[in-house]
Amino acid sequence: MTMRWLMPLALAGALFAQPNTLTRQEVDDGWVLLFDGESLFGWTGIGPSKWEVKDGAIATEPSGMGWLRSGSQFADYILKLEFRAAENANSGLFLRSATAGEPHVTGYEVQIWNENPNPKFKTGSLVNHVTAKPAKFKGGQWNAFEIRVEGDRWAVKLNGKNILQATEGKSKIGHIGMQSNGHKIEFRNIKVKPLGLAPIFNGKDLSGWRKVDTPRAKEPPVWSAKDGMIHVEKGPGQLETKAQFDDAVIQMAIRANAQGPTHHPNSGVFLRGNANQFWTGYESQIRNEYKDGDRTKPVDFGTGGIYHFQPTRKVVANDNEFFVKTIVMRGRHFGVWINGIPVTDWEDPHPEGEVIRNKQAKLGAGVISLQAHDPTTNLDFKNLRVAKLPK
């Protein structure tokens, strides 16, 4: 693991993070990185434009028209990023844009163009919708956008200055993207905080949850609520929500309590499971173990991987420390972040059905379950929150 990947934890006491990292406070507040500073993981290029990572930024040269879009789709959120371009450059940010079609038509474009001949839609405006206050980005320097979109409400800041507040409700959810429009432009520090998450654990008792044990369990799991946490020991078994969810953003803090250097508690978060049925649905793995001292070699799919299907690309978390897991699932697509670092970006390619282990894609609603894997299970969960996503 590079120092950049360790930085979010190393900067626990810092007020500001280095480029393309998060502070510990940002991690705890639910921010995630869309750009890891090293690769285009989690992004897809559309059109003939060419994108590359150079000097800690995503850059495009004058190589053709197109856009680079996020794998996951978001509804309500705060987006922060920095960009650098010549003063006469023409680009934009696409928000809530559909997978297919023109992104500024299916969603919205926040303009990056000081010299637009149409005075209504210069930098910071929602193109074809809302005019921003007069504002210019600084050519050749890093500029900061902060965009908040929540329901139909929009707010845009450029370099800390409020330049747009509006009500616009054409599109409710979609990809986040960056435009290539024939000019060189760079982007970095791209991070998102999902909004609208509500607790699914009251911090006091297991109201709203249901225990599901297996008859073969020699040591049934012991679930308890204490000090704002769900604690579990022993197993196998599971604790599932009574409510059901299909497309959603899920966040929680997890601690795997290892009992020694060779003990790495095995658990998981099951998604879209069948109520009262043991270990069904997609499993977002919890296992902070890796091979040969290399965090890019996860054991048993690794924390943040999709069990049976997609290993995590890096084991970011450590045992005996709380880490924050963020899951964004919409339709067939699953994005997972650990401590705000993107580790899984996966699309289920299988035909639709109900039995995931039979290589069927389950798209309907189901319960969220916490797994007690075996008699050595020992974990804590806290700050469990969910936001349902619009269709």
What are these regions (language model features)?
Residues 9-17:
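Hydrophobic h-region of N-terminal signal peptides that target proteins for export
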